[in-house]
Amino acid sequence: MTLGAAGAEEATGTAGPAAPEEVSGSTGTGTTGAGGGGGAMYVADADGGPRPPDWTRRPADAIRAAARPTGAVAVALRHGDLRAVVTYGSTSHHGGIPVTADTRFEIGSLTKTFTALLLAEQVARGEAAYGDPLARFLPPEALPRPRGGPITLLHLATHTSGLPRLPPGLLGSAAADWFSNPYAHFSTADLLRALARTRPRARPGERVRYSNFGVGLLGHLLTRAASGGRQGYGDLLAARVLGPLGLSRTSCGPDLPQATGYWHGRARPPWLIPGLAGAGAVRSSARDLLGLLDAVLDATPDVPSGAPHGSAPSVPVPVTLRTALVDMVRPRLSLHDGGKRLALIWNIRVRADGDVYHHSGGTRGFSAFAGFSPRHRTALVALTNASPAAGQAFIQGAYNALLSLARPD
């Protein structure tokens, strides 16, 4: 089941999340708008009009070549103080409108990076601690069967909880909508019932095992930490992260227009994942996701990174969120081969010329990638409306393009 073009980040055993294989591989109307971090952003439609900036053409075209010929593609790039969004195609295979920097795509497991930031923000506020056990937020009857010590929030955010990839009972509820919306009928109540009948596959902290179950649970626990569960994940994320960063095209539901997703070439309905929202519910745009990465790279932004030109509110980003942006990317685990680490959710590829952070995602119809290099102040976002097979090549192409940017000038 797809919740993430996860070849880029899934892990089993003790090896941890693997980067995509490092294989070699290698724009319309241009307008100037506001980008993150205080610099101008160039926006170009690659299917006609002025040429995109030269520095974007090779990575953006390589990503486009890895996508389906009829697909919608949006690529956002940052290199130092240079920013651009390059778009290709239309929002559907049969007409639609041209893709723009603000076209919304489902981002699947990239949602987990937002959940990581929300966790770090709540820790900075003092509402939660990384070492908090599940028992702080859940009644005894909802806890999983014990195996070793208690599962903590940090275990959930580093895929070391021992929980399986998917909750027990999910496959049964997904049968009727397997090819379109497999998570649509799995509720928060189902999540808690599944947790109570789960025995972890390993002792907490012992092994890295990629788990949608675990991060979906984390998203729910954060709502309990903030409001006793009265506020849903989407509303909490909007209040604590999306609003303060000015990410106005990002949300957890199909409340705004979005591109049409295609799975094996067939149009799919909007993705619904009510019970595991923190693992895969977010929709976003290339501009907004680059704004998020700008905020991470710049660490202490004075105004929201993703806000359109002229609309940034005068209220500074809260101190707790600034703290969280730094804390989220601090390495937490060093994996046994020495070449990979884990932050909160983010995978880290250790490189002599500067570490690269990355994550990918996918739904029944979309594939997404985001990554950045703090040393080189480089970031890349790639979004397309196709999955699954094309998504793997697309994710690999995006990862390779990020590596090509994250090099000394």
PLM region descriptions:
Residues A129-P144, L245:
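Short, glycine/proline-biased beta-turn/loop segments that scaffold the active-site neighborhood
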Residues R51-I107, E127-A129, G354:
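Short, conserved catalytic-motif segment at the N-terminal edge
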